[in-house]
């Protein structure tokens, strides 16, 4: 059985890792041993932050809805309760978008909520 030389496969593996490390600063971007560790750590951060992103955006939407609702005389929790009572099924992402870009539409939703809360 012939001896296996690793020239081609090693070069391909190194190229793959260094391509993933493109744009990294210093030796993290051009020394294989360090780049390999940096790429692995970057993958861990990416995995973790794909999950964190969902929580962060939800917090942002709630903060925006709360700010817009308070301008119109309701707290976020009162507003959320009123939405449920008025059976308005608009998600937080859409409500936050309305609160930022279409104040009139958000205001009309708040009026419906206030009417249900008063009743």
Swiss-Prot record:
Q: Which Pfam families match?
A: Ribosomal_L20
Please tell me one Gene Ontology term that the record gives under cellular component.
ribosome
GO MF term list: rRNA binding; structural constituent of ribosome
Lineage: superkingdom:
Bacteria
Task: Kindly give the InterPro entries that the UniProt entry links to this protein.
Answer: Ribosomal_bL20, RIBOSOMAL_L20_CS, Ribosomal_protein_bL20_C
Gene Ontology BP term (one) = translation
Q: What keywords were assigned to this record?
A: Ribonucleoprotein, Ribosomal protein, RNA-binding, rRNA-binding
Per the entry, what this protein does is:
Binds directly to 23S ribosomal RNA and is necessary for the in vitro assembly process of the 50S ribosomal subunit. It is not involved in the protein synthesizing functions of that subunit.
Protein family per UniProt: Belongs to the bacterial ribosomal protein bL20 family.
Task: Give the protein's recorded name.
Answer: Large ribosomal subunit protein bL20
